[in-house]
């Protein structure tokens, strides 16, 4: 049972336009990075391995391989640090959480592309 005031505040904070994506999709997240007095955008491209839908507390985890090392980053969906998100490729998977990809490497970690 949530308060109407809390619901109104959460709805106000969830105004950002989010593209539809699911686990298995390859996305590019543009993150605002502050270095000293200047700010720039940093792209983080990888496969969505988990998604958590909780209104304003929604989050998703993206995994990529950087210089042969697996890197995972969890983003808050409605964070002001995220400038934009774009879906590059739709993946055809049958699970909601793709944590098994952590144990796979190379060609075994590929995800089939969704055709339709």
Curated annotation (Swiss-Prot):
Keyword terms, alphabetized: Ribonucleoprotein, Ribosomal protein
Pfam family, one: Ribosomal_L19
GO biological-process terms attached to the record: translation
Signal peptide: none
Gene Ontology terms, MF aspect: structural constituent of ribosome
GO CC annotation: cytosolic large ribosomal subunit
InterPro entries cross-referenced by the UniProt entry: Ribosomal_bL19, Ribosomal_bL19_CS, Ribosomal_bL19_sf, Translation_prot_SH3-like_sf
Gene3D superfamilies according to UniProt: 2.30.30.790
Domain of life: Bacteria
PANTHER family reported in the protein's UniProt record: LARGE RIBOSOMAL SUBUNIT PROTEIN BL19M (PTHR15680:SF9), RIBOSOMAL PROTEIN L19 (PTHR15680)
Function recorded in the entry: This protein is located at the 30S-50S ribosomal subunit interface and may play a role in the structure and function of the aminoacyl-tRNA binding site.
Similarity field: Belongs to the bacterial ribosomal protein bL19 family.
Record-given protein name: Large ribosomal subunit protein bL19
């Amino acid at each position: 049972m949530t308060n109407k005031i809390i619901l109104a505040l959460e709805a106000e904070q969830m105004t950002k336009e989010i593209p539809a994506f699911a686990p298995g999709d390859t996305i590019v997240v543009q993150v605002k990075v502050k270095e000293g007095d200047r700010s720039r955008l940093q792209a983080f491209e990888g496969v969505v391995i988990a998604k958590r839908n909780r209104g304003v507390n929604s989050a998703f985890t993206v995994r990529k391989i950087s210089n042969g090392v697996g890197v995972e980053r969890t983003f808050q969906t409605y964070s002001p640090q995220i400038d934009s998100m774009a879906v590059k490729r739709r993946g055809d998977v049958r699970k909601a959480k793709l944590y098994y990809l952590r144990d796979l490497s190379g060609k075994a970690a590929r995800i089939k592309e969704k055709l339709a």
